[in-house]
């Protein structure tokens, strides 16, 4: 009885496979001709930087720099987003400080350096869109850039609760929940999932 059942299952499997392969045959008008790609945005997000609630001076300063340096910021984005893997491997700076020592003269950034091309380690160098924009902002403010790496989930709460962090930069999506804890700068990047 087991041999008969096994033989019947084998025959059923072969027949099913034959129909499946026939359905996929492009010449035979199979299922592949019925598939249509539709270019529809499923979700869109904006990335922005964050500052502590109530720090309107820093928020306005950063927003002003984002406006004034829009051309340079776009060039930074183009550099990274159009780069090959080999080119990405050449970017970055090993002269960026990674721990704060003089808060008044430093722009201290809380980030997670694990999201290329926005933030990433290139050997012992720190690179990425956010890092270069942070350097631009620090230069405009006349401050030394300090970048502190932490878990992604800690970036928002660190800016919210720890005074040494001036700004959070980690390809942060603008969301209502985060906006309850921190202030978002103007968006600097739009992304869409299709």
Where are these regions (language model features)?
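Short glycine-rich His-centered loop
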Residues: 86-89, 104-128
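Hydrophobic/proline-rich hinge and linker segments of small-molecule sensing/allosteric domains
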Residues: 49-53, 106-113, 184-194
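Positively charged n-region of N-terminal signal peptides that target proteins for export
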Residues: 1-8
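C-terminal motif of bacterial Sec signal peptides marking the signal peptidase cleavage site
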Residues: 19-23
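Bacterial signal peptide processing site
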Residues: 25-27
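Acidic, polar ligand-binding/catalytic clefts
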Residues: 32-43, 135, 139, 144-194
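Extended ligand-binding regions for polar small-molecule ligands
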Residues: 40-87, 131-140
